Regions:
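Basic-flanked hydrophobic alpha-helices used for secretion and membrane insertion
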Residues: 20-180
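Short, strongly hydrophobic transmembrane alpha-helices
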Residues: 1-21, 37
Length: 180
């Protein structure tokens, strides 16, 4: 009887462990596919609206990003890549936090995934210079950037991301200039 109780206990413990592990794996897979672990995403907020939201005590973490545009060129035909500015919280919530180096701080610094670097044929080494053409809703820019941060990236994501500095974003992002 004692053996039967032990075996039944082991069986139920194993079943619950497997079920919880499966649920966790499914949640992680969904987050990776959508590109974020955030519970909500709100687009096209003004800065005043963002500040109002961020002061809400019911919100645990809040980050923001500004979409700049898309990387263009043959290197990006099979690896769609968008360029944006994102604060540290945004980078963490979207799995874009560098594990080598740091987020962009200086005007022409850039951070990206090893997937993008492979597509461009560049080494995953901080300090690497890269020329990049960016298309926004209103213009096209070609600039040289210095790689300051690198993360693994995720092949299941619907697009890859390159993060640019706030000062560069303020110079080129159409939304900041009231053009979109």
């Amino acid at each position: 009887a004692v053996l039967a109780i032990l075996l039944a206990t082991l069986l139920f413990t194993s079943l619950f462990t497997i079920a919880i592990s499966l649920q966790t794996a499914m949640q992680e897979s969904n987050m990776r596919t959508t590109g974020t672990s955030a519970h909500a995403g709100i687009k096209r907020l003004s800065w005043e609206e963002y500040e109002k939201l961020s002061s809400d005590t019911g919100i645990k973490d809040i980050g923001y990003s500004i979409i700049i545009g898309n990387a263009v060129g043959d290197d990006f035909n099979k690896t769609p890549t968008e360029l944006r500015y994102g604060d540290e919280t945004y980078a963490e919530l979207t799995f874009n936090m560098p594990d080598t180096g740091h987020l962009p701080e200086q005007k022409n610094e850039i951070a990206t995934s090893r997937i993008v670097l492979d597509a461009m044929g560049l080494p995953d080494k901080v300090g690497t210079q890269m020329e990049l053409t960016i298309t926004t809703d209103t213009d096209t820019y070609t600039d040289t950037f210095m790689l300051c941060g690198i993360w693994d990236g995720d092949a299941v994501a619907y697009r890859q991301t390159m993060l640019l500095s706030k000062s560069y974003t303020e110079q080129v992002a159409p939304v900041i200039h009231g053009e979109t």
